[in-house]
Amino acid sequence: MIAALRAARLGWHGIDRRIAARASRGGRFTVFVHELFWFGVKQAWACLFGGLMLALLIATWMFWPANAPLGRYDFVTLTAIAIQVVLLATGLETRREAAVIVLFHVTGTLMELFKTATGSWIYPGASILHVGGVPLFTGFMYASVGSYIARAWRLFEFRFTGHPRWSHTALLAAAIYLNFFADHYGIDFRWLLFVGVAWMFGPCWVHYRVRRRYRRMPLLLGFMLVALFIWFAENLGTFTRAWMYPAQHRAWHMVPPEKIGSWLLLMIISYVMVSALYRRALPDAAAGQRG
């Protein structure tokens, strides 16, 4: 199967070279459209695991029988594990990306245990594979964010300018993680954290390669865009009753847009955890310029 995938990849590259040659003869606009197409393809490929998880939630919400011997949540958990095995066996996911998923699964589940215990949200379905009130599939939902960042880093061959020291970003991520717990006890310093995020990552640019040339964008803008898409995904998750907020018990409504800020902070934690695995890939100047 791996050999077949490699052959298909080589064949597609040949087709793309011919398309690129035609696009270059058509002028700047056709080149832009061709590159935009490839940007979308790479983004979709980076979202592979997260997209499959969302598809699972939608499909089981629509078609899973209420009297099935295996609960919906348990099916999603077992299928997520099977997806990971297939992705690793076929080479569609690297061991480093799998390590990211395991790491996120642990940290995400720990936070879920606290949040469900304090009533922040609930999981209305029954399950056998759970810890406390948290079905094990939830760790994979957090892991899909880390998987996306790790895959995007590899696919777009990220480079950075103006990047803060990794040790400083780690301290910021630890403070954010602590605040997710502390805010339930009346200690909420998220606005100070937002200021820290802007100060630390505001000057940073991420350089990414779609095809041959590198493009760049502010890293903070990238964080915000991903946080927005996570918010869209969360609305899908609550709509399919995979989990619910207290205000959604009687009838579903969209998750408040203010939650985008929480997802932005979660993005910082996710990015720092992934960048720990890619720390050697950060340029020496970027690792030591700031602070």
Give a label for each model feature.
Residues 1-291:
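Aromatic-rich, lipid-facing transmembrane alpha helices and their immediate juxtamembrane interface loops
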